Design a protein with these regions (language model features):
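A broad structural signal for alpha-helix termini and local helix breaks/kinks
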Residues: 11, 36-40, 71
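Recognition helix of helix-turn-helix/homeodomain-like DNA-binding domains
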Residues: 38-59
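Alpha-helix N-cap/N′ positions at the starts of helices
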Residues: 2, 6, 42, 59-62
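Short C-terminal boundary/hinge segments that cap the last helix of small helical domains
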Residues: 72-77
Length: 77
């Protein structure tokens, strides 16, 4: 599972059969920003790539841990 699929599902936007369109990805990104208190884990263009808004880029391990703590995810998630 790619990170964009994982994080979008956590934000309440499951993929289903087809990849979501850009508008759905943007909505998931905005929910993510709200849930994390608008913390800048990286630059905005980089975070957009985590959601596949322009290109795709997987976040660093450190950024993933920071996001997990900010969202209150448990160890298994």
């Amino acid at each position: 599972m790619r990170f964009d699929e994982f994080i979008m599902e956590r934000m309440g936007y499951p993929w289903g059969e087809n990849e979501p369109d850009k508008q759905t990805r943007r909505q998931a990104f905005l929910v993510f920003r709200q849930r994390t208190g608008r913390v800048d884990f990286a630059s905005l263009p980089t975070m957009h790539r985590w959601f596949g808004l322009e290109k795709y880029h997987r976040p660093s391990r450190q950024a993933v841990f920071q996001m997990a703590f900010a969202m209150g995810l448990d160890r298994e998630e």
